[in-house]
Design a protein with these regions (language model features):
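Conserved C-terminal C-lobe helix
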Residues: 177-192
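Activation segment/activation loop of eukaryotic-type protein kinase catalytic domains
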Residues: 85-128
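Short, conserved alpha-helix in the C-lobe of eukaryotic-like protein kinase catalytic domains
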Residues: 151-161
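Activation segment signature within eukaryotic-like protein kinase domains
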Residues: 66-67
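Conserved end of the kinase activation segment
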Residues: 133-145
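Conserved structural core of kinase catalytic domains
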Residues: 12-61
Length: 202
């Protein structure tokens, strides 16, 4: 099973990473999981967020679990001066139905003067891309390290959209949940100005 850049397999009811290497960024990604053992032996269930969405209707509890899990992990990266280019549902691993982890070492980039350098080609039709990626026409290009929060906000709305399919736009979905405690968090992630995007949880 491929989740992000991790090739994960199950043997004797335990999960293992098949493509472990000694690359510094890869090892930092594994450390960011903060699990009891790196061989995933404490895990009883594991799936990608893309598959998890097909089985579970997102609610307030699930959404808050996702945000809190990613907040802790992203803080781990930020302390080491790293950020993410962008994320989507195929980059997120769900452990034991309540822990959500970013798993793509290829999208981890070092921060220099508050910015990250995008060097990889990407698909402009990806619905999770920040607007700056869509309007950009050159590779490489620099962008604020906080730009990817937009991806996070859209990803959460996409998960909620699977529950309320009658809501046709992300704006309608966000407005529908304006009384929930994660509303402000998502609103801050979706700030039109990338330098003003914030990931704050309550």
């Amino acid at each position: 099973m491929l989740v992000g850049s991790l090739d994960i397999y199950q043997k004797n009811n335990k999960y293992y990473i098949d493509n472990v290497n000694q690359d510094d960024i890869f090892l930092m990604l594994i450390d960011s999981f903060q699990l009891d053992e790196n061989d995933f032996s404490t895990i009883f269930s594991l799936s990608s967020l893309k598959e998890y969405m097909k089985q579970v209707n997102f609610n307030n509890v699930t959404t808050n679990n996702l945000l809190r899990s990613l907040y802790q992990q992203l803080d781990f990266f930020r302390e080491r001066n790293y950020s993410i280019s962008f994320m989507d549902v195929s980059d997120i691993m769900v452990i034991n139905n309540d822990k959500f982890l970013f798993c793509n070492a290829d999208k981890l980039l070092d921060i220099k003067n508050g910015k990250i350098l995008i060097t990889q080609i990407y698909d402009k039709t990806n619905i999770f891309l920040p607007p700056e990626f869509i309007t950009n026409d050159t590779i490489p290009f620099s962008i604020d390290y906080s730009a990817f929060y937009y991806s996070l906000g859209i990803m959460v709305l996409h998960c909620l959209q699977q529950k309320d399919k009658k809501l046709y736009s992300f704006e309608e979905i966000l407005d529908y949940y304006k009384e929930y405690n994660f509303y402000f968090t998502i609103s801050q992630c979706l700030n039109i100005n990338p330098s003003k995007r914030k990931f704050i949880i309550f």
